[in-house]
């Protein structure tokens, strides 16, 4: 009798697990909306923030550098102005290799170097979610390329992660921090050059934008210059509420609490565990 009850309990527990299993669409939504923060470039903005009825139809910001002038592309399934005619392979190639179906490159403004690490399951999930958007017609001016573009690859993230690696909290944190492209800002030197070998997490780059100016913080484990003396709760508050240790509100482009507040507790724990491993730099 006891064995029978135990067997039924096992079946019920398994059934609950299946009922709550994450579908590819749910996983893709989580990655895009809680981690990768795709709205930041691909959703137009108005005076009150993102224009959600035109979500992902192309950003209103312009990035004008010595090498390129670009806007965020329309990534809705609109067949004329979006990616509605792209195959799944086309979308995956743009995400991880930075190449359009016609062979033209994407600018480094699209953080494809950080997406090379995506597991095959997660890459499939992101594509499934992108294909689920409502098509929105919005013609975005084509990019203008002025010079050769260099993309710095992220050490340890040049190929897809394995599912087994995600079971390790530190490795999982590195994975999440990579696809959240944290080092796109925090891994730049003061001159703006990405340096993931000697300046990983050091910060110090001055960003200028509609919000004003902000210097990227040191997020290494240095006890004074970095966040080595911060508690886990303080780091999580910065991520999910946009509040620094001293109570100051974090400025753009770091104020990403709208995204990171949607992360699971386990994923936040993993990111904190990974940040603790960054060598102290000053």
What are these model-derived regions, one by one?
Residues 31, 83, 89, 93-174, ...:
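Hydrophobic, ordered structural segments
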Residues 28, 35-45, 91, 126, ...:
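The canonical Cys-X-X-Cys-His
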Residues 56-90, 113-123, 198-238, 257-268:
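Electron-transfer interface patches adjacent to heme c in soluble/periplasmic c-type cytochromes
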Residues 17-33, 46, 150-178, 191-192, ...:
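Electrostatic cytochrome c docking/interface patches
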Residues 23-39, 53, 120, 170-183, ...:
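Sequence context surrounding c-type heme c attachment/ligation sites in exported
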Residues 85-90, 100-108, 192-195, 229-234, ...:
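Extended intrinsically disordered, low-complexity coil regions enriched in Ser, Thr, Gly, Ala
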